[in-house]
């Protein structure tokens, strides 16, 4: 638990580098007489990543566990530049977890790495997420969603449009998938204003994860290390939301949660 506490505190304070964290802790030897080394900290942080996610889920459920409306989106996580992609050694021992080349339609850029899929409630609390290869289509994550969620509505962007997947979600789990129409669709309709406002919530989450938690910055040299960093950042994000709830503050104002 001490490792998790130290990890969550450093992420919440915006300390993104483990080496930098331990350079700071050297000045507090009296407060941390039994402080482990940076290498031991990294190893134990990887070992406790599943426990960290379990605690995060309980906090998320305690904030708005009865949510019936969700937003879904994805975020590119680049591990190196495209030119160095073929020389990247991350995941070389396990191809199923190795990064791949992908394309981000919103940014109109090619990249090499992973894709972070996120499902959050209308209040901004992240309930589910996963990290896949960059080449995996957004729709594939919905196959995992239907195994966990049911009797709810999910708002997605145009990347989730598909009559077959919408019908499958509705018939298998009574999930209603709402997506804006493409301009060239025959049955085109203007986007509903409440739907557009709901979509802004997950975009705000991504902005906060990139700004305060620097989720797109990668120092990891292996796949497990990257996954552990992602889990730690999203867990710290949820903890700050939980702190705001306990203090009767808007849960989205995470920058002021530690004040």
Regions of interest found by a model, annotated:
Residues 1-259:
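Short alpha-helical elements
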């Amino acid at each position: 638990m001490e490792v998790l506490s130290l990890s969550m505190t450093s992420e919440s304070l915006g300390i993104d580098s483990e080496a930098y964290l331990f350079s700071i802790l050297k000045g507090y030897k009296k407060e941390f007489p039994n402080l482990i080394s940076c290498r031991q900290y990294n190893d134990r942080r990887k070992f406790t990543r599943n426990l960290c996610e379990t605690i995060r889920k309980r906090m998320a459920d305690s904030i708005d566990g009865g949510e019936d409306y969700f937003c879904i989106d994805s975020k590119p996580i680049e591990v190196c530049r495209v030119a160095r992609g073929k020389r990247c050694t991350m995941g070389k021992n396990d191809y199923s977890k190795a990064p791949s080349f992908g394309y981000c339609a919103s940014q109109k850029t090619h990249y090499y790495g992973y894709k972070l899929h996120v499902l959050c409630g209308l209040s901004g609390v992240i309930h589910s997420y996963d990290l896949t290869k960059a080449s995996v289509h957004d729709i594939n994550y919905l196959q995992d969603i239907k195994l966990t969620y049911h009797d709810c509505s999910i708002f997605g962007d145009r990347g989730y449009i598909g009559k077959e997947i919408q019908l499958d979600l509705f018939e298998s789990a009574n999930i209603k998938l709402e997506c804006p129409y493409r301009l060239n669709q025959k049955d085109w309709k203007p986007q509903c204003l409440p739907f557009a406002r709901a979509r802004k919530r997950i975009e705000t989450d991504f902005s906060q994860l990139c700004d305060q938690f620097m989720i797109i910055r990668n120092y990891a040299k292996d796949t497990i290390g990257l996954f552990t960093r992602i889990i730690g950042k999203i867990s710290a994000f949820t903890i700050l939301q939980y702190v705001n709830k306990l203090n009767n503050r808007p849960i989205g104002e995470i920058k002021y949660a530690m004040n």
